[in-house]
């Protein structure tokens, strides 16, 4: 990790995606080495919090987040990546019911293709992000 950090500009932050390996011992170890943890479920969120990761440095992404998962993430102060209009509505309701601050980022799928990358991220409804 030290070599990777040395090769990157200081403003670049390194996050561990728990979907790579959510084993608590691995997350405990990685939490000490990275700037944040990315989770995709309530169980991953629990493991990340139990590892001692700062809630401010945890992000929650993925389609189909359940109301209970959103409530738990908001209560903990996690950054939530909004991926649908339904999530916006749910988060607004949580905010109105609790008064809790809601930290969000919006995943947007632009309607263009990156030339020569082989990747097309938008151009129609997808389960990941808002077009």
Predicted segments, located by residue:
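A short, N-terminal amphipathic alpha-helix
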Residues: 1-8
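Active-site-proximal beta-alpha core segment in soluble small-molecule metabolic enzymes
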Residues: 9-131
């Amino acid at each position: 990790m030290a070599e990777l950090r040395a090769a990157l500009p200081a403003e670049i932050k390194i996050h561990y995606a728990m979907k790579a390996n959510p084993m608590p011992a691995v997350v405990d170890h990685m939490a000490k080495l990275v700037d944040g943890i990315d989770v995709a479920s309530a169980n991953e969120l629990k493991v990340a919090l139990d590892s001692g990761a700062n809630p401010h440095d945890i992000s929650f992404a993925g389609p189909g987040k359940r109301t209970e998962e959103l409530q738990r993430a908001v209560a903990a102060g996690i950054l939530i990546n909004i991926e649908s209009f339904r999530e916006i509505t749910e988060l607004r309701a949580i905010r109105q019911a609790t008064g809790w601050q809601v930290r969000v980022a919006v995943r947007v799928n632009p309607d263009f293709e990156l030339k020569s990358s082989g990747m097309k991220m938008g151009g129609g409804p997808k389960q990941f992000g808002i077009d």
